[in-house]
Amino acid sequence: MTFHTLNELIADGVRGRYILVRSDLNVPLDGSEVTDDGRIKASLPVLTKLTDAGARVLVTAHLGRPKGAPEEKYSLKPAATRLAELAPFQVTLAGDTVGASAKEHAAALQDGEVLVLENVRFDARETSKDDAERGAFADELVSLTGENGAFVDDAFGAVHRKHASVYDVATRLPSYQGDLVHTEVEVLRKLTTETQRPYVVVLGGSKVSDKLAVIDNLIGKADTILVGGGMLFTFLAADGHKVAGSLLEEDQIPVVQDYLKRAADAGTEFVVPTDVVVAAKFAADADHETVRADAIEGSSFGAQGIGLDIGPESAAEFANRIKGAKTVFWNGPMGVFEFDAFAGGTRAIALALTEADAFTVVGGGDSAAAVRTLGFADDQFGHISTGGGASLEYLEGKELPGLSVLDR
């Protein structure tokens, strides 16, 4: 694929022009407080370049999964407030997306200023499966840019969505790839076509079903796949072990067994924990103990025990594998890192990545939130992706609509 770049757009001149920018402001909130502003900070460079060049910038973004109508808890107000605190330019939030407030504020926008339009998912047409409905919403967004507008997609976390603000606007305006999207694609390309070996992939998170396609595509490409998180218990069950009350997707056991066989034939090694931390219940203060992974029901909690983290022996083994790698991709926490008693595995993986002499990539979503929650800085890793689902779909080999539509 070949894309028009942000630098090309700026070289053509943007002063006084309305530039529609799809940003990723989908940040976690605690009430009205942003708890992780990583995506907001990642959006700043493109917005700053454009405002420095005199553009009038209209930002579209989503937050959460509202049901096609305004919901206060999904308002972009907290994200826009944090953006304004961080930005060297003026930021205003419209009271709607394409209504009277958006039109009034857009008309009043001055060179070098930013207007954040309210959550695009407050309009059901944004995510519609009907091309005409999405197109009509895209037309209304585009109309805010006037006669000489342009579109910049800088929301890598949304490029796997065929949504109006990602896909359809790009068919209606001269369109450019934002610097963040460019960086993300270049990083992921190194994980698929220019990979230095050994290549170690760390997969966690709760469900193996969420990772099936990426696992399928990594067999024969990755040298080693380290399995943690809730998904590890389906791997243990596939090997004939009982997992007590731990998360288990029984319908995926045959799939995992097939993967294990194929991986052995293809030269990819799956490494499953040899010990796990088992708790009496899912709670921060739950009684817990470490047991062998093949004897989970032998814990003090019997068949009611719940595995909530990989054990220290497994964490050390995973860390050694990571430190021996030249390329590492990590997606998904090893345990319930939000509870300190069950954060040990995730912390060990993060620390190993910071110490590895390797190109290290932390997948977006929970993994990015985990490293920041546990006190690690972004610059301790080679790259922290802003796109969880988008990163996985890229590694699955899928075509991403938000990228393909930018291909010139």
From Swiss-Prot:
Keywords: ATP-binding, Cytoplasm, Glycolysis, Kinase, Nucleotide-binding, Transferase
Transmembrane region(s): none
A Gene Ontology cellular-component term: cytosol
Reactions listed under catalytic activity: (2R)-3-phosphoglycerate + ATP = (2R)-3-phospho-glyceroyl phosphate + ADP
Gene Ontology molecular functions: ADP binding; ATP binding; phosphoglycerate kinase activity
Record gene name: pgk
UniProt family annotation: Belongs to the phosphoglycerate kinase family.
Pfam family, one: PGK
Subunit structure: Monomer.
Cellular localization per UniProt: Cytoplasm
Annotated protein name in UniProt: Phosphoglycerate kinase
Residues that coordinate or bind ATP: K211, G307, E338, G364, G365, D366, S367
GO biological process, alphabetically ordered: gluconeogenesis; glycolytic process
List of residues binding substrate: D24, L25, N26, R39, H62, L63, G64, R65, R121, R161
InterPro entries named in the record: Phosphoglycerate_kinase, Phosphoglycerate_kinase_N, Phosphoglycerate_kinase_sf
Domain of life: Bacteria
Organism: Arthrobacter sp. (strain FB24)
Its EC number(s): 2.7.2.3
Pathway info: Carbohydrate degradation; glycolysis; pyruvate from D-glyceraldehyde 3-phosphate: step 2/5
